[in-house]
Structure formats: C-alpha cells, structure tokens
C-alpha cells in the first residue's frame, strides 16, 4: 500500500469516525428513549409497556439490588440515566451535592394528584419538594410468625407495641425462634429514641448513648442484623423481624406461594414508626429530561399508581389512586397508614457528620456485643 493510499485511507477513516461520533451524540441527545435505574420488579407488569405504547418512547431499564449500587453510580457522575429511584433519606443527604436536577413542576401536570399532607411530611427532607417525587411508601415495623408467637405468648397475645422487642422479658422468650433486626443504624436508633419518648431525630449524642444502652441490653437475644430478612421469615428460620414493610410483605408473599401453612403478619406499632419513601428523581446530567418528566407524569396517573401499589403491596402519595387500589392495600392500616396514625410516624432526617460518626460507632459496638 502506497503512502498516499494509506493517507487517503486514514483520512476516510477519520471522517467516518467523526461522522459516527456526531451521529451518536445527536442520538444521545434526541433519541426517543428513557434510561431508567430502578429496583428490580418494582412496577406492575404492564407499567412500562403501556407508557411505551402511549408515548412511543423506548424505556431502557437497569436494575439495582442494593442502595449502595445506586449511590455509587450517582455520586460518581455521568451515570447515563435519565430517571432514578433513590430513597428519601438519600435524596435529603445529597441535595446539596448537585447530583439531582431541580424539578420543573409545570412539566408534571399530575403533580396535583399528590397528597399535600404527605408532601409536607416529605418537605422535611426535600425543602419545598424541589428535587424528587414520591413513588412508593413503606414503613419500618415488625413482622412475625403468627403460629410461633401464639405458641410462646398464648392465643390472646396481641403484637401492637414496640414493647414486643424492646422489653427484655419479651425478646428473651423470642430468642428460641429467632429475632432479626434491620442493619440500618439511623432507622433503628430513630425507632429506639421514639420508643424512649425522645426526639427520633435528636441531635444530642447523649440521647443516642441512652438508646444504645437499651439496644445493648436486648442484643443477646438478637440472632442477626441484616437488611434483607424476608427469606428467613418466610422459611421459618426466624419468627420475628424488625425491618422494612417491603421485606416482610415479600416474606408473606413467599410464604403463601410455598403453601406450607406459614402465616406471617406485619404491624406498625402503636407508638409510631419510621415512614420512608422511594422517590423519583432526575440526575443533573440526564440527557433525556423531557422524557423523564413524561414518565413521572405518567406514574402519577391514579390508575397507573394504583396498579403499581396493587402489585407491590405498597401505599403511595397519589390521593385518587387509593380509591382505585385493592382493599388489601387501601384498607390495610399497616400499608396505607390512616391519618390518625400518620401523626405518629416520622422520617429519618439527615444529621451532621460528627453525629453520624457517633451513631455508627455505637452501632458497631452494639452488633459486636452478642453476649
């Protein structure tokens, strides 16, 4: 091959590469596509397909299985996603980092369907609800094996209070069948503080030391600390789980499918509990922002949100959706929290770095003090 031929070939290749790059960039900016990062199996079976039919926008969804995976991608930047589903606590911690786009609510007409009471509740984490919209709502409460509890405490015993776990005379009797506790220091401490009559979002380290004293007292009776608990509850390996409603409800579903006569129940204790939301947010560097707004607006349609809640067994913040949801969701006070009980619920608010170090240090000491 001659030098001139080689130069001509290089020139053609350079032009071809440049044109391909420009075409790729144009497609990235203008493609009728929406890149989503969400928990696995977190929408109704036809949620995405119906949106695609209505809008002719192709939805490309990647799934994460741990909140750490989502956080790592978002904090690294240039994730490539247009819409993500972080927890409300993560949103509150990261608003000031600039990783989320400030919402243009004029592009979300169905925003009007959101419950103003719940939005005010969430404004504690996202002032004026500027960066995120609630998707699904959950709580942190108690899941338990009905048969095992009756065997231990008698048929008339009612699980309706945090006394069930925090009183040593109760949890000591549960050790034989297994108690699992959520491995989330902020939620467990907030719950313990509230149980002790203290501010669940206290900024005083002495309050956390008091809570740690109670947790250390009951620590010998706790089998393990783990975020995912539903499989052990469903299999009967543990009889009590202090954890997320989502995990316990998954356990209930798994137990029913196994058809082994295992009855699991979930309760939000009368003293109140942590209320949390998974949110919809747009990364600041999203390429298809208008498509993200269209999907947000679609999700806030009452019928769409009702179908999602029916499938997930979660409540939501879309008021008209509750009228359309199945009774198993809308009328279950442990899923759709009634207004009188909502007053007792609390969100976990962000703390400063120094206090977080105290909380994490106390937590590690509690977990390591088995006996």
What annotation goes with each model-predicted range?
Residues 339-371:
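Conserved C-terminal helix/tail region of periplasmic/extracytoplasmic solute-binding proteins
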Residues 81-86, 223, 239-244:
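Paired acidic/hydrophobic, glycine-rich loop segments that form the ligand-binding mouth/hinge
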Residues 10-23:
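Bacterial N-terminal signal peptides
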Residues 26-97:
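Early extracytoplasmic/lumenal segment of secretory-pathway proteins
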Residues 278, 283-344:
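Mature extracytoplasmic/periplasmic domains
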Residues 90-93, 240-261:
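A ligand-binding cleft/hinge motif common to bilobed small-molecule-binding domains
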């Amino acid at each position: 091959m001659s030098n001139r031929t080689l130069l001509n070939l290089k020139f053609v290749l350079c032009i071809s590469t440049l044109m391909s790059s420009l075409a790729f960039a144009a497609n990235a900016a203008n493609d009728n596509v929406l890149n989503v990062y969400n928990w696995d199996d977190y929408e109704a079976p036809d949620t995405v397909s119906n949106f695609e039919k209505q809008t002719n926008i192709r939805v490309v969804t990647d799934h994460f299985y741990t909140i750490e995976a989502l956080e790592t991608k978002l904090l690294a930047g240039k994730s490539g996603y247009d819409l993500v589903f972080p927890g409300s606590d993560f949103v509150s911690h990261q608003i000031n980092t600039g990783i989320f786009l400030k919402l243009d609510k004029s592009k979300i007409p169905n925003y009007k369907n959101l419950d103003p009471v719940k939005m005010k509740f969430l404004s504690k984490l996202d002032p004026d609800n500027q960066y995120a919209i609630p998707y699904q709502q959950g709580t942190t409460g108690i899941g338990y094996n009905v048969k095992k509890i009756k065997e231990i405490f008698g048929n008339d015993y009612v699980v309706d209070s945090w006394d069930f776990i925090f009183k040593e005379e109760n949890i000591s009797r549960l050790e034989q069948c297994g108690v699992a506790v959520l491995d989330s220091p902020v939620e467990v401490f907030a719950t313990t503080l509230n149980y002790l009559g203290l501010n669940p979002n206290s900024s005083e380290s002495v309050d956390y030391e008091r809570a740690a004293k109670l947790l250390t007292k009951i620590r010998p009776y706790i089998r393990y600390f783990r975020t995912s608990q539903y499989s052990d509850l469903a299999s009967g390996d543990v009889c009590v789980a202090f954890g997320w409603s989502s995990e316990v409800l998954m356990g209930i579903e798994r137990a029913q499918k196994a058809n082994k006569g295992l009855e699991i129940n979930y309760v939000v204790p009368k003293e109140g509990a942590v209320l949390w939301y998974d949110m919809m947010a747009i990364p600041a560097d999203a390429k298809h922002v208008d498509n993200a707004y269209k999907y947000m607006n679609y999700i806030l349609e009452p019928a769409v949100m009702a179908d999602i809640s029916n499938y997930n067994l979660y409540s939501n913040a879309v008021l008209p959706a509750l009228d359309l949801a199945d009774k198993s969701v809308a009328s279950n006070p442990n899923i759709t929290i009634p207004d009188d009980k909502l007053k007792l619920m609390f969100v976990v608010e962000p703390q400063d770095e120094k206090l977080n170090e105290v909380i994490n240090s106390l937590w590690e000491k509690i977990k390591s003090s088995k006996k």
